[in-house]
């Protein structure tokens, strides 16, 4: 039984931060209006954010272990990045596939909640976008952060990223449906803050052709 069915029944309804020179197609990056970054768990009528134990990635290719650790820390005392790198496994080339993250998340939490969601279409289809937003809301409402595998060309970067294509993993730890934004915990350290808001539209364009664990 999928977690979506379970949720309804219960009434609950980089690959290593690697850098590669590439121009990529032009994408209009939507800036997020200045808004406060919450320091922990918050909940309003339109938004929810989760408390996590944040760590920057300890090597240039451990974004997968670091993002996985951030997600686990919302629910348990998370293991070290080294342990998670061994379990995924992660090499000097990074973490190959988001499905490895899904497996490790479920193993540590003793659950089948997390599923691997692929987004092979670039740009994503409306159905893929709708599923991503629904997954974000459902997971965050149930205190499960989402881990996303992204490909960010120079024309479509989150805050502070260098002018190269970035293959990376980061963690979604909140959302705000009032302005369709998502709160990102980013282990790379490119941005001036550990967490920052992205528009949902930008997140949806960063994930293809990779995927996410939700």
Q: What are these regions, as identified by a protein language model?
A:
Residues 29-31, 36-37, 83-214:
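Conserved active-site-adjacent core of cysteine acyl-enzyme catalytic domains
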Residues 2-107, 152, 160-163, 178:
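Active-site-adjacent structural segments surrounding the nucleophilic cysteine of cysteine proteases
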